[in-house]
A protein has these predicted regions:
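Generic C-terminal helix-cap and adjacent flexible tail
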Residues: 99-105
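Active-site-adjacent beta-strand/loop module that shapes the phosphate/pyrophosphate-binding cleft
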Residues: 33-35, 41-66, 75, 98
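A conserved beta-turn-beta hairpin within the catalytic core of GNAT-like acetyltransferases
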Residues: 1-3
């Protein structure tokens, strides 16, 4: 969404599990592999023109060298600064959850 920050992710392919989708999308967008730790929430949100369902997971990186390919800009942001970034409405719910629960990103 133009001018807003988003978490890495994307659309699930047919016959793909949520975890397989997450691993594929992170590899495609960031060039890294991950260990999925836990699913933390599902968000269903309706915008004016469309609806989205977001599934948020906690993960850890298997490799530290990030090579983003599908984003204009990326940053590591501390929990204390995360709320300063503009996110789409559905993502704001995830930001609130991870900052309240002090989950590391």
């Amino acid at each position: 969404m133009g001018g807003l920050w988003e978490f890495p992710g994307g659309k699930r392919e047919k016959e793909e599990s949520l975890e397989e989708c997450l691993e594929r999308e992170i590899k495609e967008e960031m060039g890294v592999t991950i260990n999925i730790l836990k699913k933390i929430m599902t968000i269903k949100h309706t915008y004016t023109q469309f609806r989205v369902t977001l599934h948020a997971f906690t993960c850890e990186l298997q490799s530290k060298k990030i090579s983003p390919t599908e984003c204009q800009q990326w940053k590591w942001v501390s929990l204390s600064n995360l709320k300063k970034y503009p996110f789409p409405a559905a993502n704001v719910k995830i930001v609130k959850y991870i900052t309240q629960n002090k989950l590391l990103i």
